[in-house]
Amino acid sequence: SAGEHPYSFLVSVPLGRTSYKEQYLFVYRSDMVSVLGSYYYDDGCESCGNDTFSREPFIVKFSSPTTQVQEFVLVPLHSEPSHAAQEIDALYDVYTDVINKWGIKDIILLGDFNADCSYVTSSQWPSIRLRSLSACQWLIPDSADTTVADTD
């Protein structure tokens, strides 16, 4: 049913290296937030097999004139479990690309990083560049169980 607030959405094209594809979807209140721009992160030649991300980030810049942070960027990622550490580390390159393109530092990296269990080991975390970047704040502690199942 229709609510009292207007909503809009922005959806990516189907993304993925194989016949299996996924899309990123942003749903937002159009009376509060507007889209200023979007792009797909260029992570290399997909058909050549030397791209970084299984599903490259669909980066969206928003305007929110009534909030303290009036412009911000959302960067979604659903990493491939078998390459989670490499894809999470490559978010550093996406982060710097957003800063270089739009000159903005209010960036939220979000999604299913597959960063728990055996996908990203404790020995891999120190080499993930965003973990040591002082400009980044990790909002979910490593100890949080973010799975929907009863076990990890």
Q: Where on the chain are the PLM-derived regions?
A:
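Divalent cation-coordinating acidic motifs and surrounding scaffolds
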Residues: 1-152
